[in-house]
């Protein structure tokens, strides 16, 4: 076998590490992992909205119903959350030593986009103030809190000790 063939067909090192491994992941692997982790983070937000609704907290903020759990309504927030996991995958290596803090704060990125782009485009105004006033804005911050930390927890569980 020539040197080129041996390089082409050489067994690639194991790069995903789970809980205990010390291997490193590539950028594409981190992005893919964080897409999946973001989707799980989105599921946490949807389930948290149902919890807040069941506890009566949503009504105090003027929200009348949580995100439906039936198809196809549930897929949109999961897909968008997965997309928001991609930038987290790009940032995960430099913030690895403070991953959970970064995850906790990362929920602000999609919330800021929601407040300044998506809500105004939907007619709810900047920060959703035309839809329900400041209480609606506060509710959106509250309901989205689980996104970043859940994304970080899931990414850490899949990647292991070293990104």
Model-derived features: where do they sit?
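Juxtamembrane/disordered regions of integral membrane proteins
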Residues: 2-163
